[in-house]
Regions:
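Glycine/serine-rich anion-binding loops at beta->alpha junctions
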Residues: 98-113, 200
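Acidic/histidine-rich catalytic neighborhood of metal-dependent amide-processing enzymes
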Residues: 107-183
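Acidic/His- and Gly-rich active-site-bordering loop/insert found
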Residues: 2-100, 123-128
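Solvent-exposed residues in well-ordered beta-strands and their adjoining turns
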Residues: 62, 193-197
Length: 210
């Protein structure tokens, strides 16, 4: 079995212009990689009225518990004005030891790291106890209604249980890759009123034109 190089895979993923909700063939591409590692895969497409259809991928290796799931998304925010980039955002480049391209940080490199780590683990631990799965969505950067929630609902109907889940979003505000956080440590309810113009850092063009 061939070990998958995480940098090479990250570059390949960045080349897909997967601006939410565009798939551009990336789920099929990743599915093919996972099948070679022995995964059983399913591309799940969901659509809600008024929104474009979204493709997601669920893949699992093994049938036993516990099921350890890697979760993430392959869609990216718009690249904006291409003249503001020093490179084509969908043609990855290495500069000063950093991988540059749309989605390099959020979060195609994480997906590549998942798959690379799995390829190493499977090579060294054939016949391991338990299962490994990946839940990869395509609308995290958008309205996020046809991704994780609907995939989880689908899995519940199939009585597919995820025991543990690792989300590869960057978490350390100071140095990349040096922190693991618990996703939810509690909750708080309240009411907050904010006045002004609504906007989002990923979509400044909408703010300026509103």
């Amino acid at each position: 079995m061939k070990i998958i190089n995480e940098l090479q895979l990250a570059k390949e993923l960045i080349r897909f212009p997967t601006v939410t909700p565009i798939d551009a063939g990336i789920m099929k591409f990743l599915e093919k990689k996972l099948k070679k590692l022995g995964f059983k895969t399913k591309i799940l497409e969901f659509k809600e009225k008024g929104n474009a259809p979204v493709k997601n991928l669920y893949a699992r290796l093994g049938k036993k518990s516990p099921n350890f799931c890697y979760a993430g998304h392959l869609d990216v925010v718009p690249a904006g004005n291409l003249s503001d980039w020093t490179i084509n955002p969908f043609k990855p480049s290495i500069k000063n030891g950093h991988l540059i391209g749309r989605g390099a940080n959020d979060m195609k490199s994480s997906i590549a790291a998942f798959v690379s780590a799995i390829s190493v683990f499977v090579e060294k631990n054939r016949g391991f106890n338990g299962s490994i799965s990946l839940l990869i969505t395509g609308d995290e950067e958008g309205v996020a209604i046809n991704g994780t929630k609907k995939v989880v609902d689908y899995l519940k109907k199939k009585r597919e249980k995820i025991d543990f889940c690792l989300v590869g979003e960057p978490t350390n505000p100071n140095k990349l890759g040096e922190m693991i956080k618990i996703g939810r440590r509690g909750s708080m309810n309240g009411r907050l009123t904010i006045t002004g113009v609504q906007g989002h850092v990923a979509y400044p063009c909408l703010l300026y034109t509103s």
